[in-house]
A protein has these predicted regions:
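Flexible "cap/lid" loop of the alpha/beta hydrolase fold
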Residues: 116-120, 129-157
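Conserved HGGG/HGGXW glycine-rich cap/lid loop of the alpha/beta-hydrolase fold
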Residues: 12, 16-73
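Active-site loop/oxyanion-hole signature of alpha/beta-hydrolase fold enzymes
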Residues: 54, 65-104, 260
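Conserved loop-alpha-helix segment in the C-terminal half of the alpha/beta-hydrolase fold
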Residues: 214-246
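Catalytic active-site module of serine/aspartate enzymes centered on a nucleophile-bearing elbow/loop
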Residues: 238-284
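Conserved alpha/beta-hydrolase catalytic His-Asp/Glu region
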Residues: 140-146, 155-209
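Residue in the alpha/beta-hydrolase core beta-strand immediately N-terminal to the catalytic nucleophile
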Residues: 103-104, 127-130
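Gly/Ala-rich beta-loop-alpha elbow adjacent to hydrolase catalytic centers
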Residues: 107, 111, 115
């Protein structure tokens, strides 16, 4: 299991290198780095590993995936789940891997909070953002956290008092049981919920200070699609792609269309190749 230690914490990391450079094509010997930042609690780097990371690597980028603090196989600490901690963890992992030049961040759901705050805190280290159904931007405090915290609070009660992990393991659902046990330890055994409640949204005035290009991809029926529209209005260089017929599960259920849009955007901004499937995906 590949690991790095950053800020005194063990992080599970996976890296996918691009194919060898082809001198005849003039391919870059130092490929762009694309870092994937996943969502909360039951999510981990595997959600990208089996969807986006492989094709991004095949297109000529170095894909870096890591489990957020307390998630997946990364170390679970009692505290340290604020946005500032997550940003510091991100750059700590990149430093440990030796990636100090600007990188592209691909973020899903809560990962958008990390990516957006990273771009504002260290603009010299972020070359671009891909925000997939991402939380973070909002007009008012509490606008984006209320529903998420209510959902996590209810999940915490089910995990603790109904012993969901034990029930799943008892009927032979080992993977889901292990995920539930990890989620239980995270939401009921750390400061995660309190830290999330204290996170402030990134408001329009701050979004205007985002200097890198942004691709925002949201589902037509998503309950946070307004975050994508806010990004479009407020970020100086933003492309918004609304996926018709989809809700918050764009990454899992709309992978092919998402890849086509994202790979074409990366080709334009990062200089990666455009696979045939992406060229057939239509204009942004």
């Amino acid at each position: 299991m590949p690991e790095v230690t950053a800020r005194g914490i063990r992080f599970h990391v996976q890296t996918m290198d691009p194919p060898p450079a082809d001198p005849a094509r003039g391919a870059a010997s130092d490929p762009p780095v694309v870092v994937f930042v996943h969502g909360l609690v039951v999510d981990d780097l595997s959600s990208f590993y089996y969807t986006l990371a492989g094709p991004v690597s095949a297109a000529g980028a170095r894909a870096v995936l890591y489990d957020l603090r307390g998630h997946g196989r990364s170390e679970r600490t009692p505290a340290g789940y604020s946005a500032a901690d997550a940003v510091a963890d991100l750059f700590g992992v990149l430093d440990a891997l030796g990636h100090r030049r600007p990188v592209y961040l691909v973020a899903n759901s809560f990962g958008g909070v990390v990516a957006l705050n990273a771009a504002l805190a260290r603009p010299e280290r972020v070359a671009g953002l891909v925000m997939i159904e991402s939380y973070g931007p909002a007009e008012r405090a509490g606008e984006w956290t209320e529903n998420m915290l209510n959902t996590l609070g209810k999940s915490a009660l089910v995990l603790e008092y109904e012993r969901l992990a034990d029930q799943l393991l008892a009927i032979g659902w080992r993977q889901r049981g292990r995920q539930a046990r990890t989620a239980d330890a995270l939401v009921n055994g750390t400061s995660l919920l309190d830290d999330l409640a204290a996170i402030e949204p990134v408001r329009p005035a701050d979004l205007a200070a985002v200097t890198c290009p942004v691709l925002a991809v949201y589902g037509e029926h998503s309950d946070i699609v307004d975050a994508g529209r806010l990004l479009l209005r407020s970020v100086p260089e933003c492309t918004l792609h609304i996926m018709s017929g989809h809700a918050h599960t764009v990454l899992r259920e709309g992978t092919e269309q998402l890849l086509a849009v994202m790979l074409r955007w990366l080709a334009h901004h990062a200089g990666t190749r455009v696979p045939v499937m992406a060229m057939a995906g239509g204009a942004l």
